[in-house]
Regions:
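Core nucleotide-handling region used for phosphoryl-transfer chemistry
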Residues: 1-175
């Protein structure tokens, strides 16, 4: 991969940060936040970084299953967060370059919103509840990580132990 849109290869820079700590048969997926040289990676979003700085936020990890098969084990989000926190704890020099993901809520949406009836357009109604839930998700609020005034992008939903390893993004309207 070459530099492409940016003046340098931001993906190689991010890979170089994490590569020494990634085990064989382990794949780490991450979001690169901040700046790629003089350009914001996501226009209008500094994520607390000064121009020219960035950090990597691992959000997904897969490893080879212990049974020796070629099937990958998909880590749950708590495991990804814990791996990242341990990495930074063991290597404090990475604290500004690697950040753990924020988990806004861990549990079922039926438990979070017991008043939303499963039998009455549950999918639509629970998404509406989430969009209006400032306590848990802060949708349509300013992104607290940013120094500049930018609205949150949204949230990602994942199901623990999902055999399909799906992720769903609920984007903020202001994004």
């Amino acid at each position: 991969v070459g530099p492409g849109y940016y003046d340098f290869d931001i993906w190689k820079e991010a890979t170089d940060i994490l590569a020494p700590y990634i085990d064989e048969d382990m794949t780490v997926y991450g979001e690169i936040c901040g700046w790629a040289g003089e350009k914001a990676i996501q226009k209008g979003y500094d994520y607390g970084c000064k121009q020219g700085e960035f950090f990597v936020m691992p959000y997904r990890i897969t490893t080879k299953k212990k049974d020796g098969s070629d099937t990958k084990y998909e880590w749950n989000v708590d495991e990804v967060r814990q791996w990242t926190e341990n990495l930074v704890k063991e290597h404090p020099e990475l604290a500004e370059k690697v950040h753990p993901i924020t988990i806004f809520y861990h549990g079922t949406l039926a438990d979070l919103y017991p008043n939303v009836k499963v039998s009455e357009h549950w999918h639509e109604n629970v998404l509406q509840e989430m969009m209006n839930d400032k306590e848990h998700f802060g949708m349509e609020e300013l992104e607290p990580m940013c120094k500049n005034k930018s609205y949150r992008e949204g949230i990602v939903l994942r199901i623990d132990d999902d055999p399909f390893a799906e992720a769903f993004k609920l984007k903020c309207k202001n994004f």
